[in-house]
Amino acid sequence: MKKILIYLSFISFILCSCASLQTNPPKDFSYVEIKTDDYVLATWQKIKDENSLVKIYVEGDGHAYNSKGYPTKDPTPKSHFLRDIAFNDTSENVVYLARPCQYIKSDEYDNVDWTTGRYSYKILNNMAQAIKKIAGDKNVILIGYSGGALLCGLIINHYQEELKIIRWITIAGLLNHTRWTKYFGYIPLKYSLDLDTIPNIPQTHYVGEKDTIIPCWLTLQCVDERNCVVIENAAHDKGFNIKDIVNN
């Protein structure tokens, strides 16, 4: 068995409770709405150097289902976990990219877009459009959280050359929804594409040892363990060392 790198110590800035969440973005981030073919997508952007690459943080699936298992009317995330990571990234060009229908309400949106069709070609294409509008011809590093990890993988497989994606980072990432729904007995995502082929680009996958939402072994089944960093005692949205991620 290949050696898995386990981080045993945490330095400085650890996100361990909701009390540490930022309610307001830093002054150097601006809220920008991006219009694509089918959606208006919410972003928070810090662009300081037109000649540098862009790091784009792609949100997870958000609040897709309520506690009774029914689709919600608003999939906006309840947690600011990924936003906080993006806001603490000191790189010159950093963007937090929400998923379709998050933060922006519309009667025209269909809950299929954040439930069984959350990784459909329609979603994939619109997210790729947004990334292109954000980055233009700049190189891109995609950082996907939870279900956003799978979406990033699909985008890389379909649009890597067009979008100049040079690296893929995942945090508590879902990399195969078929295995995930089967394991938990969830409704299959029948209108979604799956990540049947892992992108062949430089990549790092941060997984929480105690993640009960997306167990780390599910991620380790999908990718080379040499590209995985198992964070001891980390859960799905707690215990990750932000500095390790943003400085990757």
Label every model-predicted segment:
Residues 173, 178-238:
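The feature captures the conserved acid-bearing segment of alpha/beta-hydrolase catalytic domains
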Residues 36-42, 46-98, 103-104:
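Short, surface-exposed "cap/lid" segments of acyl-processing enzymes
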Residues 143-152:
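Gly/Ala-rich beta-loop-alpha elbow adjacent to hydrolase catalytic centers
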Residues 109-135:
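Alpha/beta-hydrolase active-site loop
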Residues 239-248:
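Post-His helix in hydrolase/transferase enzymes
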Residues 154-166:
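Conserved hydrolase catalytic core segment
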